[in-house]
């Protein structure tokens, strides 16, 4: 399926995937993430149930603190 991931086109195998599956596919392991699908925030507790479909716009932002 083709989606927009962090403002870049991305081809990911499958017809639909959960956020958790996309994080695993992309090897994202940061503990503090902000995820949006088509502009809607996804709670961490919903990563297994929030589905991404063909044409969706997904943003995954890792929160990093520094000084």
Where are these regions (language model features)?
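Ubiquitin-like/PB1-type beta-grasp interaction modules and other compact soluble beta-rich domains
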Residues: 1-66
């Amino acid at each position: 399926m083709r989606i927009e991931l962090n403002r870049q086109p991305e081809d990911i195998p499958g017809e639909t995937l959960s956020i958790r599956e996309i994080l695993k596919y992309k090897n994202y392991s940061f503990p503090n993430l902000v995820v949006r699908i088509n502009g809607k925030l996804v709670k961490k507790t919903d990563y297994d149930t929030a589905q991404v479909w063909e044409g969706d716009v997904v943003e995954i932002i890792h929160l990093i603190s520094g000084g």
